[in-house]
């Protein structure tokens, strides 16, 4: 019995390749041109979220081929497959956005089912858009087979009349156009140049935030998450990932060895330090849930509170992901956090080494101002803040990176769906100083917890970003700027306080103290609750109906199954 066959005896793929009873299974493999040696090697699933919906995922199929070469070079048998993804930039601003967050669960579920059904021994997952990144990482820790995550890379910035632009500028251009500050011709010109290449949105929006998380949490190779999609070095990272996953099989290093409580805290720290997307406060608890670790919005917020904001990245700052990669990448950011005591250095990673060991050779780059030293930060607390109060007993989240005013008080202006709020913004029928409330957009109530970028970007484009506030039980895009509070829980659909608000109620927001309150007594809120009744939904069948029945609250990551804590047998141990 050779070494490879010996390893095979403890791997899931033995159930489809070994012994006389599996002769029918082997006949299928021979039909695809596999050799006897390849059949008896470890099977590595190479999963990508490739599609032609948008530039975010268009480069993934190319990169998957490099992964397969790496797996084969290291003595494994790669098995490529695709799963779905919903691209937020295309889904934004219409009913399609209801599909976005549910797609995270669909990605995790479909990868799990494919790996289980075909008895793969390991997984390399490639993802390129907002929900596909956490969805793929959730699948990895759920299955707990040796795994490496690969980000497809960010888009290059566009150039509009000498100015660097991103898709954020496009959404804000719509607001400018609505008030006559941008002509039809200018809008046409900028939309043709804003997105010049393959790759996900280029600033520290949700995709790049979760890419940063993938390195910090230990599931991605150092530097691999920073290189833009068009850069050929991405193929080298992919080749290496294919080789490295074979080492993880040999060493039996699994995702749950990597994704520990400390690793989750590291991930939250890099989100705060980079002024990342508020969506991380949904995705980190969901990843933790797959491991059986309780790590909710309040745990994330505690890390945010004590982590300095050091990376000057858009939307709150000046630079895009390409700029950070070219001055040292995510390891440069992590190194200054580690040196100043904001990261746990003893967490194991997919390299087989610890965070501290991976960062040992990283030298500080003094010839740049993209990443500030952690002892000389942009601000001493993170770029994302958790809130709690009588309007949000289960918490809420706000991105404060780049904001100067962290307190706001004003009368509520209530809307029961995003379309109505956007129409009011487009028609300028709101007033300066109001707090726009968009409710019944939570995980159950939407269903799907839509992002409100269309509305927030229009407000910013109208020059009102600092003159109003917006709160919702839905979500915000990582591209959102301004005083915008999301994930307010409990959501309106289950009778949360946000569903009891009336126009004119005074709302007090304090991102310094971390509070979100309405100036109403407990008695008044209780009285209004007696008159509240659940709203009917139009989604009475299909995937969105199933999602609404299963999904939990935002505070726990909006998850749809009991999680690792209730697991009796892990797939990797079959």
Swiss-Prot record:
GO terms for biological process: branched-chain amino acid biosynthetic process; isoleucine biosynthetic process; L-valine biosynthetic process. One of its GO terms (molecular function) is dihydroxy-acid dehydratase activity. The keyword Iron applies. Pathway: Amino-acid biosynthesis; L-isoleucine biosynthesis; L-isoleucine from 2-oxobutanoate: step 3/4; Amino-acid biosynthesis; L-valine biosynthesis; L-valine from pyruvate: step 3/4. The keyword Metal-binding applies. It comes from Bradyrhizobium diazoefficiens (strain JCM 10833 / BCRC 13528 / IAM 13628 / NBRC 14792 / USDA 110). This is Dihydroxy-acid dehydratase 2. Functions in the biosynthesis of branched-chain amino acids. Catalyzes the dehydration of (2R,3R)-2,3-dihydroxy-3-methylpentanoate (2,3-dihydroxy-3-methylvalerate) into 2-oxo-3-methylpentanoate (2-oxo-3-methylvalerate) and of (2R)-2,3-dihydroxy-3-methylbutanoate (2,3-dihydroxyisovalerate) into 2-oxo-3-methylbutanoate (2-oxoisovalerate), the penultimate precursor to L-isoleucine and L-valine, respectively. Mg(2+) binds at residues 88, 130-131, 451.
